[in-house]
């Protein structure tokens, strides 16, 4: 039985078959950050109190990890998962690593100045807009920027025009990476988040169905998945953004997975570094693994603190920096 209390003020558990995970726990609030290093396991209390038995169970779990991991207070194993939805950029692929360094300067360049404008303040505002919308289709960042232009008395371009110019600039940045991969001059692992293949192989070995949903335009996602050797894991289940932004969303992908397979949300796990897939997965009762990846330092095993805090805030069950502990992670999720 799954006694899952949704965090909407209700203390009444909702019964579902087979799963043993809570969406909300009355006995604990907040989360713990566990760091495994040379001197063993350290437990850092974030912002809540819990009972000693809970502390003990978390401690036992994290001793199994060689790297960093953070469990939300509501995490419990869910052994009935059979479908897994991945985000792409920053979750598996690093081909587009550094994309904010393209988008932010473009926005700064095109943002109308105002009297008494503080460049640092405008930059912080734009960066917050960009990262808050990370995980959604690129067009939403462009729509938000168009609003900022109008707020300052400017006449914004159509959001698609901003998007196409951004993609043109981004293509210049990543072209050498694409060329190296397509010409076999680079090993795909160089542009995969650390441990990605081990995780994917572990999921395939369990017989779980894999899906890829990205805010990047679908033709680019399919091209880059193929360059990285990931297309075989996902087959026809690779979905990406369209110019008609209303025709695609990660929420729609999740609804399609559940409908076509005639399953409830507790059969679903979402894995991503953006708030959208985490939030959408949790909204249907799925388990959410947040990847707070430090893309600039792949393999270092460090959290990106902005991602970590943001993803915990939208309900992530587990936060990891990469997949160095892929086998342990899957065992813990299954309750082994």
Task: Mark where each language-model region is.
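Active-site neighborhood of HAD-like aspartate-dependent phosphohydrolases
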Residues: 55-124
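A short, structured active-site edge motif that brings together acidic residues
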Residues: 160-161, 231-247
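Acidic, Mg2+-coordinating phosphoryl-transfer loop and its flanking beta/alpha structural elements
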Residues: 270-318
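A metal-dependent, Asp-based hydrolase signature
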Residues: 128-205, 209
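Substrate-recognition element of Asp-dependent hydrolases with the DxDx(T/V) motif
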Residues: 103, 187-191, 196-226, 239-243
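Short acidic-hydrophobic, aromatic-tinged amphipathic segments that line or gate anion-handling sites
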Residues: 239, 318-323
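Conserved Lys-Pro-Asp/Glu-containing loop-to-beta segment of HAD-superfamily phosphomonoesterases
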Residues: 248-281
